[in-house]
Amino acid sequence: MQYKTAEFFSSIHTSILENALSGSHLIKNIEAKLIISIVDTLIRYYLEIPEGLTFDDVLIIPTRSHIISRSQTDLRTRLSRNIFLNIPLISANMDTITESGMAIALAREGGIGIIHRFMTIADQVDEVLRVKRSESVMIEQPYTISRKMNVAAAVQMMTDREVSGLLVEDEDNKLVGIITRRDITFESNSEKKVSESMSKDVITARQGITIEEAKEILHKHRIEKLPVVDTKYHIVGLITSKDIIKMEQYPYASKDKKGRLLVGAAVGVKGDFLERTETLLDAGADVIVVDIAHGHSDNAINAVKMIKKAFPSCELIAGNVATGDGSKDLIQAGVDAVKVGVGSGSICITRVITGSGVPQITAVIDSAKVTRDYNIPMISDGGIRTSGDATKALAAGASSVMVGSLFGGTDESPGKTIVKNGKKFKMYRGMASFYASLGRKYREESSQLIESDDLNDYVPEGVEAMVNYKGSVVDIIRQVVGGIRSGLSYCGAKTVIEMQKNAKFIKITSAGYTESLPHDVDVV
């Protein structure tokens, strides 16, 4: 838009100059010089300062569609070079948005959650394991307990691991029984041995059993847990009726090759990031996200190179950047996907504090020119308030969108519910906010005294806020997905890639935006 405007002013410039030189009586030379000076200034302005657009500045022009029903659309998309999602939604790696609860809920719907890094390595690994163990074709390395332990230990382990039963093994790691909460409910003697309370006649299956065969055994014997053992009766895995039911209940869930839910985890660019990456990958994290506010920096680029060198097969996402040049540098460093967005989040004040950033639609379009050439997926991160925003980001070139505030305040987001003036709220904060940074500093320097000067020197680029309690995130996910599907149908597209080929944007005025909202009525 800015270049067409400049060309227009340039044509006026030429016309005025020709008239002045030819002695036209339409205008006097002195008037021509004044107008030329003004036009020159406008040309310089439009050539040197490009225009930046965000979601509210544009609409997608509807086109002819052969889509009969939005159910015909397919939202399958690439998260990274080799990982696919069934819906293009990612929950943000923020400490008030994504831990295991959010990651499980989103993966079951077809997306993925990125576990935030603002915790110890052990705690972050535990969150990843919770997602991986939440459901699978067969639970590998199921939780076990020695038959010599007491009932109190069994209860504690079930509580800590959030499971309803444990496999019991002997000194040779052979299966000898199974103990469930049902076996020890109302047990008055907590010192009683597990071997005395467990069920000893355990129905088992051999390695290689199919799901259909497992369903038959579970039904025939009216049991809920089916241990899988080898020829020497060593425990290989565990198949549960709950997992099979979940497979049928969530047919579009995002899963790995072992049938476990997909989950990602964030790391930084300093300190323990290599150790953290290795431990998270060992725990089963499907993708690692290098998490830094200014991704177009030597710190981020060097971290990407180091991670890729140490773990070549790791699926690696990095960001955040706001330009095509930033995306190109990260891709050349070795990333498998680029995360785009600087200052677009609802609790981010980077643009206000630093004066830096690019409006999100422009940032996505500029980055898409590069990521498309390299065939690398791009994630639009920040500013998603509605399904329409998500649709625009995808149409502009993103393969998926990362969501923060929209998922905040839900049952699955971390943190306690706050009641204020009779209304329910949950905390939501930017990871560059003062208290988030203070908490991070305490964790990183727990053995050292934090000087007040260190805190005074810190300039927050995020804020803390309360958001209305919203209930389950599943309802929000399905509303957003439904809106995106409708957006595809308005573009005459069955897939996200088709929409990107078909989509044409139109810039709107503030009046056009107002017209897009409910108006001249009292909304009930």
Task: List the model feature ranges, each with a label.
Residues 107, 129-132, 155-159, 176, ...:
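Surface-exposed amphipathic alpha-helices with a cationic face
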Residues 69-86, 92-94, 123-160, 168-170, ...:
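Bateman/CBS regulatory modules and CBS-like beta-alpha motifs in cytosolic regions of diverse proteins
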